[in-house]
Protein backbone atom coordinates (compact mmCIF):
# COMPACT_ATOMS: atom_id res chain seq x y z
CA UNK A 1 0.00 0.00 0.00
CA UNK A 2 1.37 3.43 -1.00
CA UNK A 3 2.05 6.06 1.63
CA UNK A 4 -0.62 8.77 1.84
CA UNK A 5 0.21 12.02 0.06
CA UNK A 6 0.42 15.11 2.23
CA UNK A 7 -1.68 18.03 1.03
CA UNK A 8 -1.27 21.68 1.91
CA UNK A 9 -3.89 23.99 3.32
CA UNK A 10 -3.98 27.77 3.43
CA UNK A 11 -3.11 27.45 7.11
CA UNK A 12 0.13 25.59 6.27
CA UNK A 13 1.11 28.49 4.03
CA UNK A 14 0.20 30.92 6.82
CA UNK A 15 2.50 29.16 9.29
CA UNK A 16 5.40 29.12 6.80
CA UNK A 17 4.99 32.84 6.12
CA UNK A 18 4.62 33.56 9.87
CA UNK A 19 7.96 31.86 10.57
CA UNK A 20 9.50 33.78 7.67
CA UNK A 21 8.24 37.11 9.02
CA UNK A 22 9.70 36.34 12.43
CA UNK A 23 13.12 35.82 10.82
CA UNK A 24 12.84 38.95 8.63
CA UNK A 25 12.20 41.19 11.63
CA UNK A 26 14.88 39.44 13.72
CA UNK A 27 12.43 38.90 16.55
CA UNK A 28 13.91 37.06 19.56
CA UNK A 29 12.13 33.73 19.94
CA UNK A 30 11.91 31.69 23.13
CA UNK A 31 11.59 28.01 22.23
CA UNK A 32 11.46 26.83 25.86
CA UNK A 33 7.93 28.08 26.53
CA UNK A 34 5.53 25.47 27.81
CA UNK A 35 2.31 24.31 26.21
CA UNK A 36 -0.27 21.88 27.49
CA UNK A 37 -3.24 20.58 25.57
CA UNK A 38 -5.76 19.13 27.96
CA UNK A 39 -8.44 18.38 25.38
CA UNK A 40 -8.76 18.33 21.60
CA UNK A 41 -12.17 19.14 20.19
CA UNK A 42 -13.48 18.98 16.65
CA UNK A 43 -13.39 16.61 13.71
CA UNK A 44 -9.93 15.13 13.24
CA UNK A 45 -9.48 12.65 10.35
CA UNK A 46 -6.17 11.82 8.69
CA UNK A 47 -4.61 14.87 10.34
CA UNK A 48 -1.34 14.92 12.24
CA UNK A 49 -0.49 17.38 14.98
CA UNK A 50 2.79 19.26 15.31
CA UNK A 51 3.47 21.82 18.04
CA UNK A 52 5.84 24.74 17.36
CA UNK A 53 7.04 26.74 20.37
CA UNK A 54 7.83 30.20 18.98
CA UNK A 55 7.17 32.46 21.94
CA UNK A 56 7.36 36.26 21.83
CA UNK A 57 7.14 38.22 25.06
CA UNK A 58 5.67 41.30 23.37
CA UNK A 59 1.89 40.81 23.06
CA UNK A 60 1.36 43.79 20.72
CA UNK A 61 4.19 42.67 18.46
CA UNK A 62 2.67 39.18 18.29
CA UNK A 63 -0.63 40.64 17.10
CA UNK A 64 1.08 42.84 14.50
CA UNK A 65 3.02 39.93 13.01
CA UNK A 66 -0.11 37.77 12.92
CA UNK A 67 -2.09 40.45 11.07
CA UNK A 68 0.76 41.18 8.64
CA UNK A 69 1.14 37.46 7.88
CA UNK A 70 -2.60 37.12 7.33
CA UNK A 71 -2.58 39.99 4.82
CA UNK A 72 0.51 38.60 3.06
CA UNK A 73 -1.04 35.18 2.54
CA UNK A 74 -4.46 36.45 1.47
CA UNK A 75 -3.13 39.10 -0.95
CA UNK A 76 -3.68 36.79 -3.94
CA UNK A 77 -7.21 35.77 -2.96
CA UNK A 78 -10.35 37.16 -4.55
CA UNK A 79 -12.43 39.87 -2.90
CA UNK A 80 -15.09 37.32 -2.00
CA UNK A 81 -12.58 34.95 -0.38
CA UNK A 82 -11.06 37.80 1.63
CA UNK A 83 -14.48 38.83 2.91
CA UNK A 84 -15.30 35.23 3.89
CA UNK A 85 -12.03 34.84 5.80
CA UNK A 86 -12.47 38.23 7.48
CA UNK A 87 -15.88 37.19 8.77
CA UNK A 88 -14.76 33.73 9.92
CA UNK A 89 -11.57 34.86 11.66
CA UNK A 90 -12.79 38.18 13.04
CA UNK A 91 -10.11 40.32 11.35
CA UNK A 92 -10.98 42.76 8.57
CA UNK A 93 -8.23 41.91 6.07
CA UNK A 94 -9.13 44.91 3.90
CA UNK A 95 -8.78 47.44 6.74
CA UNK A 96 -5.43 49.28 6.48
CA UNK A 97 -6.02 51.73 9.35
CA UNK A 98 -2.94 51.47 11.64
CA UNK A 99 -5.19 52.13 14.67
CA UNK A 100 -7.63 49.36 13.75
CA UNK A 101 -8.10 46.76 16.49
CA UNK A 102 -9.76 43.57 15.15
CA UNK A 103 -12.76 42.14 16.95
CA UNK A 104 -11.05 38.79 17.54
CA UNK A 105 -8.15 40.54 19.34
CA UNK A 106 -10.55 42.36 21.65
CA UNK A 107 -12.40 39.15 22.42
CA UNK A 108 -9.20 37.18 23.03
CA UNK A 109 -7.68 39.94 25.18
CA UNK A 110 -10.74 40.09 27.42
CA UNK A 111 -11.00 36.33 27.92
CA UNK A 112 -7.37 35.15 28.01
CA UNK A 113 -5.53 34.41 31.25
CA UNK A 114 -1.90 35.42 30.71
CA UNK A 115 0.77 33.35 32.50
CA UNK A 116 4.50 32.86 31.99
CA UNK A 117 3.87 29.31 30.81
CA UNK A 118 1.06 29.08 28.27
CA UNK A 119 -1.38 26.35 29.22
CA UNK A 120 -4.00 25.60 26.57
CA UNK A 121 -6.59 23.49 28.33
CA UNK A 122 -8.82 23.02 25.29
CA UNK A 123 -7.76 23.08 21.65
CA UNK A 124 -10.61 23.37 19.16
CA UNK A 125 -9.29 22.33 15.73
CA UNK A 126 -12.68 22.73 14.10
CA UNK A 127 -12.82 20.45 11.07
CA UNK A 128 -9.54 18.93 9.97
CA UNK A 129 -10.51 16.32 7.38
CA UNK A 130 -8.10 15.21 4.68
CA UNK A 131 -9.38 13.47 1.53
CA UNK A 132 -9.01 9.69 1.43
CA UNK A 133 -5.36 8.55 0.92
CA UNK A 134 -4.21 12.09 1.79
CA UNK A 135 -2.81 13.62 5.00
CA UNK A 136 -2.86 17.08 6.55
CA UNK A 137 -0.14 18.33 8.89
CA UNK A 138 -1.79 20.57 11.47
CA UNK A 139 0.81 22.85 13.05
CA UNK A 140 -0.08 24.44 16.37
CA UNK A 141 1.99 27.56 17.02
CA UNK A 142 2.53 28.63 20.61
CA UNK A 143 3.27 32.33 20.13
CA UNK A 144 3.95 33.04 23.78
CA UNK A 145 0.82 34.85 24.95
CA UNK A 146 -2.62 33.48 25.65
CA UNK A 147 -4.18 36.29 23.59
CA UNK A 148 -2.07 35.62 20.49
CA UNK A 149 -2.67 31.87 20.79
CA UNK A 150 -6.40 32.59 20.88
CA UNK A 151 -6.14 34.57 17.62
CA UNK A 152 -3.96 31.87 16.05
CA UNK A 153 -6.59 29.26 16.93
CA UNK A 154 -9.26 31.27 15.09
CA UNK A 155 -7.00 31.58 12.03
CA UNK A 156 -6.29 27.85 12.10
CA UNK A 157 -9.97 26.90 12.25
CA UNK A 158 -10.76 28.97 9.17
CA UNK A 159 -7.71 28.42 6.96
CA UNK A 160 -7.26 24.72 7.64
CA UNK A 161 -10.45 23.96 5.69
CA UNK A 162 -9.06 25.45 2.48
CA UNK A 163 -6.92 23.07 0.42
CA UNK A 164 -4.16 24.36 -1.87
CA UNK A 165 -2.80 22.78 -5.04
CA UNK A 166 0.90 22.18 -4.35
CA UNK A 167 1.74 23.36 -7.88
CA UNK A 168 0.34 26.81 -7.03
CA UNK A 169 1.70 27.18 -3.52
CA UNK A 170 4.24 29.82 -4.56
CA UNK A 171 1.38 32.07 -5.64
CA UNK A 172 0.65 32.43 -1.94
CA UNK A 173 4.27 32.73 -0.80
CA UNK A 174 4.89 35.96 -2.75
CA UNK A 175 8.40 36.02 -4.20
CA UNK A 176 8.45 39.81 -4.32
CA UNK A 177 9.36 39.73 -0.64
CA UNK A 178 12.66 38.11 -1.66
CA UNK A 179 14.47 40.76 -3.77
CA UNK A 180 17.70 38.76 -3.66
CA UNK A 181 15.91 35.86 -5.37
CA UNK A 182 14.61 38.04 -8.21
CA UNK A 183 18.01 39.73 -8.59
CA UNK A 184 19.70 36.31 -8.86
CA UNK A 185 17.28 35.22 -11.58
CA UNK A 186 18.01 38.39 -13.58
CA UNK A 187 21.79 37.89 -13.28
CA UNK A 188 21.51 34.24 -14.38
CA UNK A 189 19.39 35.26 -17.37
CA UNK A 190 21.95 37.90 -18.43
CA UNK A 191 24.83 35.42 -18.12
CA UNK A 192 22.86 32.89 -20.15
CA UNK A 193 22.23 35.39 -22.99
CA UNK A 194 25.89 36.49 -23.03
CA UNK A 195 26.96 32.85 -23.14
CA UNK A 196 24.72 32.08 -26.12
CA UNK A 197 25.98 35.15 -28.01
CA UNK A 198 29.58 34.16 -27.26
CA UNK A 199 29.04 30.63 -28.59
CA UNK A 200 27.49 31.97 -31.80
CA UNK A 201 30.43 34.34 -32.28
CA UNK A 202 33.02 31.56 -31.84
CA UNK A 203 31.17 29.32 -34.27
CA UNK A 204 31.03 32.17 -36.84
CA UNK A 205 34.78 32.86 -36.50
CA UNK A 206 35.68 29.18 -36.89
CA UNK A 207 33.52 28.88 -39.99
CA UNK A 208 35.09 32.04 -41.49
CA UNK A 209 38.62 30.78 -40.84
CA UNK A 210 37.64 27.43 -42.27
CA UNK A 211 36.62 28.98 -45.59
CA UNK A 212 40.02 30.60 -45.95
CA UNK A 213 41.99 27.53 -44.86
CA UNK A 214 40.26 24.84 -46.85
CA UNK A 215 38.89 26.56 -50.01
Swiss-Prot record:
One of its GO terms (cellular component) is virion membrane. Keywords: Disulfide bond, Late protein, Membrane, Transmembrane, Transmembrane helix, Viral envelope protein, Virion. Its main location: virion. Disulfid bonds are oxidized in the cytoplasm by OPG088 protein. Unglycosylated because produced in viral factories instead of the classic ER -Golgi route. Disulfide bonds join 33-55, 47-128, 108-150. It is a single-pass membrane protein. It is found in: Virion membrane. The chain crosses the membrane at residues 179-199. InterPro entries: Virion_mem_poxvirus_L1. The keyword Acetylation does not apply. Component of the entry fusion complex (EFC) composed of OPG053, OPG076, OPG086, OPG094, OPG095, OPG099, OPG107, OPG143, OPG104, OPG147 and OPG155. Except for OPG095 and OPG052, each of the EFC proteins is required for assembly or stability of the complex. Belongs to the orthopoxvirus OPG053 family. Component of the entry fusion complex (EFC), which consists of 11 proteins. During cell infection, this complex mediates entry of the virion core into the host cytoplasm by a two-step mechanism consisting of lipid mixing of the viral and cellular membranes and subsequent pore formation. This is EFC-associated protein OPG053. The lineage of its organism: Viruses, Varidnaviria, Bamfordvirae, Nucleocytoviricota, Pokkesviricetes. The gene is OPG053.
Amino acid sequence: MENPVRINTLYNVFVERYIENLSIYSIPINSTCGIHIGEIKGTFKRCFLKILNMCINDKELSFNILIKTLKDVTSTLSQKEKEELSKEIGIDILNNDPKYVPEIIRNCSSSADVTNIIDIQTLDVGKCIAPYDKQILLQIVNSGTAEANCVMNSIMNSMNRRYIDNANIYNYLNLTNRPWFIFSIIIIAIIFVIGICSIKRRIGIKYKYGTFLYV
